[in-house]
Structure formats: C-alpha cells, structure tokens
Amino acid sequence: MQIKIKSKEKYLIGVSGGSDSMFLLNKYKNQDVIVAHINYNLRPEAIFETLLVSKFCQKYNLELKILSFDSFKIKKNLQSGLRLGRYQFFEKIYKEFNCTKLLVGHHRDDFLETVFLQKKQKKIVTFWGIHKKNNLFNMEILRPFLYWRTKKQIIRICQQKKIPYLDDQSNFTGKYQRNQIRFLLEKKSDFSLFFLFLFYYLINIFKLIILKNQKKILQNWQKTGYNINFFKKIKIKSKIIFLFVNQNFDNVKLTRGKINEIINFICGKSTSGAFLLKKNNYIIKKKWKILPKSSKI
C-alpha cells in the first residue's frame, strides 16, 4: 500500500525529469513541497530535462531549486561523486526550508536491480535491495512507490495522464553495471519479477528480525566497554564485527576476509595493538578492551 502523506509536513522532492520522478512530483504537486533538480552537464540533452522540470513547476506554482553541477571536476569514481554532490545539495535545501522528508521516485524495478547488484558485487548485506525509509545526510528519506509500482506501470500512467517526462538516455546503454542488470531483468516475465520481489521482501522481514537480535548483542558488548573476553564468547562474531565497524566508522569496505582478520586480531594473544581499517581509522586493542578510533593512539 502507498504510504500516506501528512499535509502538515513539508517535503523535498528530488526530480530529474525522468518518468519516475515526474510521476512522483505529479502525485504530490498539491502538497507542501520543494522541488530539487540537478543538471550534471554530462549530456547535451540535459538542458531539456531542466526546462521540462522548470515548466512543470511554473505551471503548478512549485518552489524549484536547481543545481548546475560541474561533473568534470570529479577525477575518480564518477557515480560516487555525483551521488555525494546530489545528497549534499538535497541536504542544504532540506535544512533551509525545514523539510520533514525527502521523497524520491524509486520503484520495484530499482529494488530488484539493487538486489542483483549486491549479489554481483558479493556484498555482505543486512538488507536486500533498497529500504522504503531510511536516514541519510541528516534527512529522512521516503520512497512512496518502492513496493507497489514498476517502471512499466509508471510509464503507462504517465502516458495516460499526459505527465511530461524525458528519461535519461544513458540508462539505455550498457556502460554501467546497473544498466546491464536492468537489461537482464527486462527479459523476465512480469510474474517472475513479482515473485523475485516477493521472495526478497520476505527474506528482508526475516533479516530484520535477526538484525534486531544482533544489535542487542552489540549493545551488550558495548556496555562492557567492548571487553575482549565478552567478545570471545559471542557465537556470531562475524555478524557483530560487521555491525561494530559500520556503527563506529564511515565508508569502510568490509570483505569476509577482512572481518576474519579483525576477529583474529581481537582474539589474538597480544593484549595491545592497532588494526588498520583504512587511512587514519584503527581498531585499538588496549587492556583487554577494543577502542574504535579515527586516528591511532
């Protein structure tokens, strides 16, 4: 079911000009909203997307904030750089207008694409796909259509209701991993895709129950001051280390091998030492306790 929007709240809506975000904007255009649009200046046709969003907002008297982003300044990992720039822009507007939620147009296909991307990258996950609600960059993010609309449905409704949109043509090339996964999923029947979604949706319910128990164990360990002897008695050490690192450090890539190295470091005979997670980020072993530190002491 669709999440109900409370009229007393103020929403920031991220709008690219594509079918997903324009469908979302049209749905909530009569609510108290601020519209945020970014022109990444990567494609000549991007200006037409900006004009489309501007025209729609003018028609319905919606507040619009536009960022012209210099994507060519990003030297490494373009996708990560664009994502960071996007959310920093959203955060600025969110604070400026005292918004209560950021709405984005993710749908069921995005959920499945993320699942298969996680599998392809062999990521350790506590949740498959995308969360319907989460907090990021000090914003509460809501994806109203994540579980109940597909890309096909959104395009069909946009065409029926004459909602204007211009989909990013780079989404139809095989340049990015996500696009490659999208092409594979498009070959599957609607029934197969729904079954896949339902399968991972139910797995996530089970995962969240397990995660709740794991967080309790982590909290109990934390209460001991991260005592090493307490940790040695924990049966699911790898799960707890995964949570411990993600709770105390930012942007640390964890593999199963690295988690095992951390466990061996903690449980080793030495009573002191430092384990380097990444530059200036260490797990310190001192007096039978573990200390998460952003710089070595």
UniProtKB/Swiss-Prot annotation:
User: Binding of ATP: at which residues?
Assistant: 16-21
From its record, what is one biological process in GO terms?
Answer: tRNA modification
Enzyme class, first EC level, given as a word: ligase
Query: Principal place where this protein is found?
Result: cytoplasm
Catalytic activity field: cytidine(34) in tRNA(Ile2) + L-lysine + ATP = lysidine(34) in tRNA(Ile2) + AMP + diphosphate + H(+)
Against CDD domains, the record matches this protein to: TilS_N
Molecular function terms in GO for this entry? ATP binding; tRNA(Ile)-lysidine synthase activity
- Any single GO CC term annotated in Swiss-Prot or TrEMBL for this entry: cytoplasm
Q: Where in the cell is it found?
A: Cytoplasm
Assigned keywords, A-Z = ATP-binding, Cytoplasm, Ligase, Nucleotide-binding, tRNA processing
UniProt-listed InterPro entries: Rossmann-like_a/b/a_fold, TilS/TtcA_N, tRNA_Ile_lys_synt, tRNA_Ile_lys_synt_N
Return the EC number.
Answer: 6.3.4.19
Q: Which family does it belong to?
A: Belongs to the tRNA(Ile)-lysidine synthase family.
**How are the domains described in the entry?**
The N-terminal region contains the highly conserved SGGXDS motif, predicted to be a P-loop motif involved in ATP binding.
Task of the protein: Ligates lysine onto the cytidine present at position 34 of the AUA codon-specific tRNA(Ile) that contains the anticodon CAU, in an ATP-dependent manner. Cytidine is converted to lysidine, thus changing the amino acid specificity of the tRNA from methionine to isoleucine.
This protein's name:
tRNA(Ile)-lysidine synthase
